[in-house]
């Protein structure tokens, strides 16, 4: 149920190509029967991710809003989140029954984080293809996100990444904070992410 403070807002961040849009699509398809959902995507100069989600039929088009952030996508989710907050306010007006809004950041680096004014929970997505050392490199996305998703685990043998090393490093860098290995192509790991959102988001 949406609270008097509005819907749960979940930020989805991660480097370009890590699988943010694929994750957003899978979460929408897994949760849309039970909850009233919407998505705000951030792209630098286009609305490409929003259009991709409409094409994937993740949600009806009126529930997907794309914002163009200009040159610094991380500013729109952190220092000046007003463009995203405005998009959420507009969705709220049109869809007053909203339970949950996903905010997908533009492709960013390991240092980008969501402002607490914008996101109640944060998911950070990295890809096995970026190298097995990514978890131990740290950065706020790795260490501070509420949930770390290590995506494309199926490609580990092809890129020479050792999942056991990645698991050990992620556990060391994150302490008690959870992380999940996933393969969005096959939907592997989606259920655990949904369970996390229900448990920690109070849905």
Swiss-Prot record:
InterPro entries: CobW/HypB/UreG_nucleotide-bd, P-loop_NTPase, UreG
GO molecular function, one term: GTP binding
Gene Ontology terms: biological process: urea catabolic process
Entry's localization field: Cytoplasm
Residues annotated as binding GTP: 14-21
Cross-referenced CDD domains: UreG
One Pfam family of this chain: cobW
Keywords: Chaperone, Cytoplasm, GTP-binding, Nickel insertion, Nucleotide-binding
Task of the protein: Facilitates the functional incorporation of the urease nickel metallocenter. This process requires GTP hydrolysis, probably effectuated by UreG.
Family label: Belongs to the SIMIBI class G3E GTPase family. UreG subfamily.
Known partners and oligomeric status: Homodimer. UreD, UreF and UreG form a complex that acts as a GTP-hydrolysis-dependent molecular chaperone, activating the urease apoprotein by helping to assemble the nickel containing metallocenter of UreC. The UreE protein probably delivers the nickel.
PANTHER family, per database record: UREASE ACCESSORY PROTEIN G
Protein name: Urease accessory protein UreG
Gene (name only): ureG
């Amino acid at each position: 149920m949406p609270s008097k403070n509005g819907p749960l807002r979940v930020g989805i961040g991660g480097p370009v190509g890590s699988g943010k849009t694929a994750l957003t699509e899978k979460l929408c398809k897994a949760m849309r029967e039970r909850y009233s959902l919407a998505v705000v995507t951030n792209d630098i100069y286009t609305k490409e991710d929003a259009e991709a989600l409409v094409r994937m039929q993740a949600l009806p088009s009126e529930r997907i809003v794309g914002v163009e952030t200009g040159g610094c996508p991380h500013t729109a989710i952190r220092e000046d989140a007003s463009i995203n907050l405005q998009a959420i306010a507009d969705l709220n007006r049109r869809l007053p029954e909203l339970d949950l809004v996903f905010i997908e950041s533009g492709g960013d680096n390991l240092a980008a984080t969501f402002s607490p004014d914008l996101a109640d929970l944060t998911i950070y997505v990295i890809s096995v293809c970026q190298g097995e050392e990514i978890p131990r490199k740290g950065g706020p996305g790795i260490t501070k996100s509420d949930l770390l998703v290590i995506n494309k685990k199926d490609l580990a043998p092809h890129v020479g990444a050792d999942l056991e090393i990645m698991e050990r490093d992620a556990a060391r860098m994150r302490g008690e904070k959870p992380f999940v290995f996933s393969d969005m192509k096959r939907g592997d790991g989606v259920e655990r992410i949904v369970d996390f959102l229900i448990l920690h988001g109070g849905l």
